[in-house]
Amino acid sequence: MSDHDSGNARRGRASFGAFVRKPVERGAPAGAAAEQGGLDAVQALPDDAVEVGAVVDAYGLKGWVKVATHADAGRGGDALLSARRWWLEKGTQRFSARIVQSKTHGDTVVAQPAGVGDRDAALALRGFRVFVRREDFPALAADEFYWVDLIGLDVVNEQSATLGKVVGMIDNGAHSIMRVEYPSVGKDGRPAAAERLIPFVGVYVKTVDQAARRIVVDWEADY
């Protein structure tokens, strides 16, 4: 069993929906991007939009942008490569952009949004966060999962004891680990949240039922 940023989780370092954002430059003043053609202003992002990266620079002279992906390019970056439409957001500015071409470039993804015709127009997009719709993610094999789809699932053991809810994922380089949060009591006697870490590997994870929003594990509550 494996989970994915996009591709095998053992290769990726960050996740869609559970990532550490990379720092990005502030970029052009607010409103500069809106002055260029080719981008459609929108009031809101799609309901299934997932943040997958941020525009960090222009690429070349012909309107291409360079995106630092929240998951490794070619792995988590696969969603950027497969989606033909991106959504961009910075502050109160939101745009929909049709992507003409995209490809990996080192550890980034570079792309040509329609209507962004030169380097200055591309530079105006620095600092915009990039989203794609979950439905545009590449399909995975039956035993593979995107981290964003695991966040929020309930975790129970084989004796039906409730262990908590997945609130995040960690990649330790060898495999992924679920951060499972559950209610507890703090040192002051007040209700508090506690966390247990469960490796997301086949020896412990028995079933993942996304429809039922439940993960069954071979794990005891007192581990």
Curated annotation (Swiss-Prot):
One of its GO terms (cellular component) is cytoplasm. Its main location: cytoplasm. Keywords: Chaperone, Cytoplasm, Ribosome biogenesis, rRNA processing. Residues 142-223 form the PRC barrel domain. GO terms for molecular function: ribosome binding. One of its GO terms (biological process) is ribosomal small subunit biogenesis. An accessory protein needed during the final step in the assembly of 30S ribosomal subunit, possibly for assembly of the head region. Essential for efficient processing of 16S rRNA. May be needed both before and after RbfA during the maturation of 16S rRNA. It has affinity for free ribosomal 30S subunits but not for 70S ribosomes. Binds ribosomal protein uS19. This is Ribosome maturation factor RimM. It comes from Burkholderia multivorans (strain ATCC 17616 / 249). The lineage of its organism: Bacteria, Pseudomonadati, Pseudomonadota, Betaproteobacteria, Burkholderiales.
